[in-house]
Amino acid sequence: MASSNATNSTSAASAANTNSSAFKSAELAALSGVEAAKRAAAYAAVDNHVKPQHEIIGIGSGSTVPYVVERIAQQGPAVNAKRWFVPTGFQSRELIINAGLRLGDVDSFPSIDVTIDGADEVDNALNCIKGGGACHLREKVLAEAANEFVVVADYRKNGSQLGTKWLQGVPIEVAPFAYAKVLQNLKKMGSDKAVLRMGKAKAGPVVTDNGNFCIDAPFPEAQMKDPSDLLKRIKLLTGVLEVGLFCNICKSAYFGNDDGTITIKTAAGDVQEGVHFDVSKAPATA
C-alpha cells in the first residue's frame, strides 16, 4: 500500500510539473487597457469556475472567450486529456480545435459541468442579451445544460438594465418561412423597429448555424424592465425558435475594465470592483 501511495504521489507530482512547465513555456502576449482586462477577466473566471475535476465544459463566443480557452489550455494536458469541450458555434469550435482540446457536442453531453460564454449586455440581476453573433439558440442550450453558467465580457457590456447599452434590439431566431409574420407580431407587441438582420458580406439575410433567420427587435424601456416577461411573450409567437434574452441563468459575470481591473458580479447580488488579477500566475491543476 505504501508503494502504491508513493507511486500515486510521484505521478501527481509529475503531472503538476508537466502542467507548470507547459504554462511557464507559454509566452503571454503583451496587452494593454481593456484588452488586458478582458484577458484578466477570462483567466479569473476560469480559475474560479473551471476546476480540475470538471470533465464537460461548454465554450461560448465573443471577443473575451479566446482568453478563456487560452487559460484552460494552460491547465495542461494532464488535466485536459480527460475533458470534452462543447462549442456553441463556429468560433468556439475553431478555438477548441486550434487549442488541441477534445471536441464534443451537446448530443453526446446533454449535461455540462460549466459553460463560459460572452454577452452583448448584462444587467444588475445578471440577465443577459445574447445573439449579436446569431448563435443564441445553441448558446442557450449550453447555458441551460450547465450546472454553472458564467459570463465574461468587457465593461461596455455591464449595464443596469437591458437595452441601455445594447441598442440593436433583442435577437430572435426564427424559421425562415415564418419571419414576415413574426415581424408583424413583434411590431404589434411594441417593437416598431424590428427588422430582419441582413448579412454584411453577402446579399440577403443572416443565416444562423441552424439554417434559420435572425430578427433584431428593439423594445421600449418599459418592456425591457421585465425581461423575463418579455421573453415569455416573444417565445409564444409561432415561428420563434429562440430569444436572445437569458433570464435567471447566469450565476457569475466577469467584466474587464478600461483601467485594467475587473468587476465581478454574482446572481446573489455581490459585486467586487477594481479587482486586480495576476495573469502570470499558473492556473490550478489539482
UniProtKB/Swiss-Prot annotation:
Q: Which UniProt keywords apply?
A: Cytoplasm, Isomerase
User: Among the entry's GO cellular component annotations, what is one?
Assistant: cytoplasm
Q: In which pathway does it act?
A: Carbohydrate degradation; pentose phosphate pathway; D-ribose 5-phosphate from D-ribulose 5-phosphate (non-oxidative stage): step 1/1
Q: Which Gene3D superfamilies match?
A: 3.30.70.260, 3.40.50.1360
One annotated GO molecular function is:
ribose-5-phosphate isomerase activity
Recorded catalytic reaction(s): these are:
aldehydo-D-ribose 5-phosphate = D-ribulose 5-phosphate
Q: Where in the cell is it found?
A: Cytoplasm
Statement: the UniProt record of this protein carries the keyword Isomerase: yes
Q: Which CDD domains is this protein grouped with?
A: RPI_A (cd01398)
Q: Does the keyword Isomerase apply?
A: yes
Q: What is its EC number?
A: 5.3.1.6
Q: Which family does it belong to?
A: Belongs to the ribose 5-phosphate isomerase family.
Q: What is this protein called?
A: Ribose-5-phosphate isomerase
Q: Which organism is it from?
A: Mycosarcoma maydis (Corn smut fungus)
Q: What gene does the UniProt entry assign to this protein?
A: RKI1
